[in-house]
């Protein structure tokens, strides 16, 4: 089981197509055989700018006050789909990352959380239809990303969720400081590790870009 956990990074999303490839090409994506691939555009000591192509995901949405409660329900629903809960009864390979879309909100407000599993390469063209009407296919456009250092926050706990959100807010300030253009009101978290993984976790936060992302050498 892949779950969001420990993350510090942020990405810009644009428009274009994503490759699903062998995880051996990505040292930090080592718990599944296939991962979402990317091209490194530029980097600094703190950030990487990446490009991803578009790819097909299987997604579901859950509404809750707490992200961790919504994520748990959404994960179980999606896992049931890849474990045979589809019209073919087919078991589908787990991939990474697991993606979750989070809408900005006040702590006490309910919000929609949309979780997505990346479909493996062999199921990109014609995946089996879900038997649960709450599970849908989504084609996400290609995107560029900013990637920064990581921490080991556990998003399964409420305290760590607070920490994660504070880091997200910090990166928003960083984006604004370089006059980056991005869509407001939501962001994405990408998780690469099982909840059983205690060390060397790797997770990221994504923001959707509007226009070309700014490379580190353009910040000076």
Feature annotation, model-predicted:
Residues 2-220:
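A solvent-exposed interaction/effector surface
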